[in-house]
Amino acid sequence: MKKIYLLALMLIFVLNTAAQDFRYGKVSEEELLEKQHPKDPEVNAAVLYKSHKVHYDYNSINGFSLITEVHERIKIYNKEGFEWATKKLVNSKSGSDEVKVSGIDGETYHLENGKVKSDRLRNDAIFKDDLNKYLTSTTFTMPSVLEGSVIEYKYTLRSPFLISIDDILLQYTIPINNLEIDVKIPEFFVFWSHFNPRAKLEFKIDRSTKIFRYTNLQTTRSGGIAVSHSIKNNKIEFLENTYSIDKKDIPALINENHVGYLNNYAAVLIWELQLTNFPNSTMENYTQTWDGVAKKIYDHPEFGNELDKSRYFESELDDLLKNLSLPKDKISVIFNFVKAKVKWNDYAGYYTDNGVKDAFKDGAGNVADINLMLIAMLKYAGLKADPVLISTRDNGVPLYPTRNGFNYVVAGVSLNNELIFLDGTDKYLEVGMLPYRARNWQGRIIREDRSSEWVDLMGGSTSEKTTRLNIKLDDQFHFEGQITEELDGFYAKTYREGFADLNNDERIKKLEQSNGKIIISDLDVQNEKEIDKNIKKSFKFELPDGAEEIGNNIYLNPLLFLTTTSNPFKSEDRQFPVILKYPSSIINTVNIMLPNNVKVESLPANQALSINDKDVLFKYVVVQNGNFLRISTELTLNTILYLPEEYEVLKEFYNQIILKNTERIVLIKT
């Protein structure tokens, strides 16, 4: 009996080991049969296994290279998970040096008549591209992916940039069942490793040290007719520090609305070089300050030198400025000139790609090409303009001083004790506005004397939307009326992005679709092209079914299609802070003329709401004057950050708004 028991235990162990075989190509039938994730059934895909190994390779010809080897196995549960079948690698280059991608291998596995079949990733499905002179991309999409497939791929990166180990992502928006991290660093490189402090997960790093021996045998030949051979044995010996993580069941990073950039909260292993100390060489300290980082960036020829160039634009700019004396007028004219002259090529960066002169001539450039040109023009016009370094939302919030902490640059103009931001990459941006991607907490302004300091990016004026409805309810209880609306700030920008390229019929159709069952006529929009002016919009409308007739009573929602009916905050709890896009204010005024065959039975009560210690307000006021009703609402959100512990209060604030917005006026027939 004891032997049978031991045999059973051994069998279970063997079966379990077989199911957990993560060697490349060893996908099991059990993995393919799995219909949903056992611990998170709602996910569309899951990483069954991820291996990320980093080490330094050495040879006597080229010295050290930094090698990264990645192997991932991913289960696709449904069609929504197909996006995980495409992998894009973006790598650095500098001059003739670049990160080389090699050894890309991939297989898609599926079951066919009970047998495991696979389709191999073909070379013609791997695409390599030079994004700009600083970045390359390698993209591949796994073949023949179906619901239930398992995909597997591996690749190797060989980098000449020895002092830069890429951050290692330890958490995805899908679960990771098994994670293995192994980083080996020679004693000559001293890195500080730490985790993203905003992440909710904790990981343990196992550290160990061993002696690494490298042996190189060189054969030489000498002599004329008589040849002699000698073998030279070169040995290099050094300590190698190993950092390992072996973790199972890493939960998915849950996306929450109004979270900013989700990966800011992902578990990440971050590497910062402290120093290098090679034999027979002086120790070099790489620890930096933010002042030092800013100075190095400014002194780079593709940054500071570009700010000094002006001859290429002087004649055109002189013509534009000759009748202007007020600084605000100069700012507006120069800003609009740059936006019209140079189109953004969708690439970020604080170093120029084409260079400001070629970008001006060709009409296209990256962020630095455009905004360093803008700064140079502003300075030429006598304004105090300086570059502001930014980390975009998808680049995260910089945690320690490094040039990689920034990836964007805008102009900052100091005028009347105010810092005015300008970004020429978006034709719909107004003076003083930053695009959402660049509104990421703090930027670093660098002055001409190389001094620098942090500046707030999240402030700015409140974006306002003011709407007035004048409505007549006829004796058949149908609505007809006119709406006038004024939009500024980001509300105006959003309108221009969505409507500027549409013809009138297309605009009416889009407005009708977004405003319930109204029928629109006489649409008029002003200041669409004048970006520095507010959008003014008006149209007439009919709404046949705006009131509900039950017996002798008529029920109507006085806000009609302006009603907020859905709470953006639905989840029971909150892991991450709520970050609204910008301060905002929405003011609605509805004037209703009632027919003579009804009288008011009941009206919603007036209400005012606020959140303690927040610049947040909601007001709802109803006034009756005979057959005329006026309903006024205001929602002002000047506070854009709410911590998780404030989530319940914010959620309830919106619940109360929705309850009030859905209250109805009751009329009675006379």
Language-model regions, residue ranges each:
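Short coil/turn segments at secondary-structure boundaries
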Residues: 84-88, 195-197, 305-313, 333-334, ...
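A carboxyl-terminal module marker
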Residues: 509-670
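Bacterial Sec-dependent N-terminal signal peptides
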Residues: 1-23, 670
